[in-house]
Amino acid sequence: MSWNIAKRDEPWRELVKMDADVALLQEACSPPDDIASHVDTGPRDHWDSHAWNSAKGLYDRWPMVVKLSDRIEVEWFKQVGPISDTGEDEIAVSGIGTIAAARIIPRDTTTPRFIVVSMYARWIRPHLSTSTKWRVGYADGSAHRIISDLSAFIGSTDPETHRILAAGDLNTIYGATDDNPLALPARDRTITDRMDALGLAFLGPQHPPGRQARPVPQGLPPDTRNVPTYHTTRQSPATAQNQLDFAFASRGFDRSVSVRAMNAVDEWGASDHCRVLIEVAG
């Protein structure tokens, strides 16, 4: 599953109650003491960008790959700076607080191992020289850094040569029309285009399943299949409008992967983002 937990404690407690094997988290801090022994967040250098960046005050929440069951083994990739050659257990990272990666080895020997990537496209503020009116900035820059980093696991134009599952909060609105006031549609489209060029298929989540916002939110086409995965402080799960969370998988491997937004009001969870349930069948 994938979930932006907004640096909150209660989502951790909800995680341990689920029958999940692994969680791809975004904006996570350390788990609360009362459940820390029930989750395995792996070595700190797989998620904490301070391991390779000396500016200790830059960030306080992270993407993580968290082991939740003994049905799998997890081999976490250590973050290193943006270098061209890495070790077998390393991933070169170009953004702070944007990515965590690991290899998942199911104990069920019928399911081949695969790589998971937790993605968080942080907002970036334009340079002061732009005199921008954008209040929060842009997220596509972080998304492209993530794509550059995960592309290290791709060494062929044939997508059958890799098994990658990437999911998380990209802070973009899929399929937004050019009049959408909350998006940069032309720039955002380059994210899915580039994923597709790498052989990573878009999985959604899309309706059906998942609850759609009604009426259709401003800035989306009438036939949108988007499902809201995020609500603002002025909204609730019942009034959530926009989908910011997405999943991708290597083409071919994607046929074994299903995704669903757990966005019904009674299953949303204790974050401003809902959970995205991801099931790998083989």
Model segments located where?
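Structured beta-strand-rich core segments of catalytic domains in phosphoester-bond hydrolases
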Residues: 28-124
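Low-complexity, intrinsically disordered Gly/Pro/Thr-rich segments
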Residues: 255-266
